[in-house]
């Protein structure tokens, strides 16, 4: 991810450096004070030069430079099985490892989202009296991505960047994109004010009108919302968007609460659970090095037990020092009142007061404050893994000082796309072209502006192309056109490290230190980046000699 960005930025920045001038001479050295004031200067073309030819010569030289750069980037591709660091962390300091269950210890096949979608759709029809015609809609795994925001009152799904700006072309009402002009009219621009955004946990509450879909289970929910919206719109059915959102949310919730999903998985566990060997290997490695381990999940006891028996074996509880089910995260991390209850071998809740959390036992509910009191596991010696940035990680890192690891399954597929030559070629040229536009915008004559408009058109087309590399509707989970997504902003804040799956831990020893890659800030020299020297693009030379 950072490889192409750093290289492309290096190409653009060095192109810009080669294009800066003072009084017509190329400034290859630090500009003198008088020249430094001319922040938007570009090479002054000789008076007799045809500006159109001059600019296109610059363009083609930059293109050649980009083409020469791509092979060196292809020799330094990112490993999809790597662990990436937002914050320096040494595994030598970690004594206790904690895990969520769903999409952390256990991964599910593509069949699960289809199951959730179909079950929730049928609940809408059978219990909420929605039109039977919506049964024609099937789950489309290629429609939505995680991290999207849904405007509950306007019934539109969208992608928002780290600065609360909507990415144009990613606003959907039903299954159709909303034109940019309509979006701008709707929001009086493209910025979403803080008071309209979702609350701390991504929910639409306390006056917030947007819901952010952060967990992997939300993918079928977004698709179902969009499908039902589409049906109502296509058939001119008058409806209240708030009621629709609530009904879909309740139906998705009931798939879990009523046990529909749990029973289906337990009945055909091989169909739904995958990568069992990898999880088993990670747990065995940590146990062999004497690490303490615990499990805190919102899933029920019998469901977790059957899944872990399939993944690890019937003695799976021997690996964990503490097992907590139906924890009701994120409330588990904030509520100081709910006591733990022991679950016996038959799944019956006992009423004994819990004075100690014993190995081999399963406990229900409880709260983190009591957990800390009974275990003494505090601070940065604890590393907890989960897939939900808010419910699993936010409170732990902000309030309790635990180290946190985010499991982002989409990371592996995105990195594989980013390692393709087509993506690298496109992104490197896009960044270089942006640098050219930045420098050459000072030429205000009509002929130059026509050339710049062509460049802007090409840039817009390329940005749309880069979006479609990942998802035709919404693009990358991690980026909008230019900025990080709101999802990535929260990931960077709440996760010390992140990876595609727990199996990535197998590539590192238990004493490994993760160092965040130093990337240059906007006001820093690109040369300060820690990118390999192979990414140092040559300066663009003057297109015209004196």
Curated annotation (Swiss-Prot):
Mg(2+) binds at residues 100, 102, 387. Coiled coil: none annotated. The keyword Magnesium applies. It is an enzyme of class 3 (hydrolase). Keywords: Hydrolase, Magnesium, Metal-binding. One of its GO terms (molecular function) is hydrolase activity. The active site is at residues 100, 102. Its EC number is 3.1.3.-. Its cofactor is Mg(2+). Substrate binds at residues 249-257. It comes from the Eukaryota. Binds 1 Mg(2+) ion per subunit. The keyword Hydrolase applies. Belongs to the 5'(3')-deoxyribonucleotidase family. This is 5'-nucleotidase domain-containing protein 3. It comes from Mus musculus. The gene is Nt5dc3.
């Amino acid at each position: 991810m950072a490889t192409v960005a750093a290289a492309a930025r290096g190409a653009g920045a060095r192109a810009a450096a080669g294009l800066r001038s003072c009084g017509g001479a190329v400034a290859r050295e630090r500009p003198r004070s008088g020249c430094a004031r001319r922040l938007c200067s570009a090479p002054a073309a000789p008076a007799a030069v045809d500006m159109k030819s001059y600019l296109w010569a610059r363009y083609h030289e930059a293109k050649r430079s980009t083409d020469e750069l791509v092979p060196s980037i292809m020799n330094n591709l990112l490993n999809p099985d790597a662990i990436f660091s937002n914050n320096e962390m040494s595994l030598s300091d970690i004594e206790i490892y904690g895990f969520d269950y769903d999409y952390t210890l256990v991964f599910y096949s593509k069949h699960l989202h289809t199951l959730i979608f179909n079950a929730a759709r049928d609940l809408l029809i059978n219990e909420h009296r929605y039109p039977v015609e919506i049964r024609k809609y099937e789950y489309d795994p290629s429609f939505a991505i995680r991290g999207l925001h849904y405007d509950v009152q306007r019934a539109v799904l969208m992608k928002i960047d780290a600065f609360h700006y909507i990415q144009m072309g990613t606003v959907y009402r039903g299954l159709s994109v909303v034109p940019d002009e309509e979006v701008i009219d709707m929001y009086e621009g493209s910025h979403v004010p803080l008071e309209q955004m979702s609350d701390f946990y991504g929910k639409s509450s306390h006056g917030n009108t947007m819901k952010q879909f952060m967990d992997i289970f939300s993918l079928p929910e977004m698709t179902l919302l969009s499908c039902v919206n589409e049906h109502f719109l296509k058939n001119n059915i008058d409806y209240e968007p708030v009621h629709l959102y609530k009904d879909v949310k309740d139906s998705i919730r009931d798939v879990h609460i009523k046990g529909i999903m749990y029973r289906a998985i337990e009945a055909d566990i091989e169909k739904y659970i995958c990568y069992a060997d990898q999880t088993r290997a990670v747990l065995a490695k940590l146990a062999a090095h004497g690490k303490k381990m615990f499990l805190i999940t919102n899933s029920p006891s019998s469901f977790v037990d059957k899944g872990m028996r399939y993944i690890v074996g019937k003695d799976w509880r021997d690996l964990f020092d503490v097992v907590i089910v139906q924890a009701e995260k994120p409330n588990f991390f904030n509520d100081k009142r709910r006591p733990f209850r022991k679950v016996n071998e038959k799944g019956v809740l006992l009423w004994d007061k819990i004075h100690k959390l014993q190995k081999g036992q399963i406990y229900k509910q409880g709260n983190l404050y009591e957990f800390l009191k009974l275990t003494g596991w505090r601070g940065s010696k604890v590393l907890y893994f989960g897939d939900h940035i808010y419910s699993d990680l936010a409170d732990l890192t902000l309030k309790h000082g635990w180290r946190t690891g985010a499991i982002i399954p989409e990371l592996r597929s995105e990195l594989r796309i980013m390692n393709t030559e087509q993506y690298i070629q496109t992104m490197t040229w896009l960044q270089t072209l942006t640098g050219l536009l930045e420098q050459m915008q000072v030429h205000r004559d009509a002929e130059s502006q026509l050339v710049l408009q062509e460049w802007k058109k090409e840039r817009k087309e390329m940005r749309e192309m880069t979006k479609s590399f990942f998802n035709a509707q919404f693009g990358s989970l991690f980026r909008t056109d230019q900025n990080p997504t709101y999802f990535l902003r929260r990931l960077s804040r709440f996760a010390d490290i992140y990876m595609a799956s727990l199996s990535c831990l197998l590539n590192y020893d238990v004493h490994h230190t993760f160092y965040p890659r130093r990337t240059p800030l906007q006001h820093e020299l690109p040369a300060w980046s820690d990118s390999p020297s192979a990414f140092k693009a040559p300066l663009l030379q003057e297109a015209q000699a004196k």
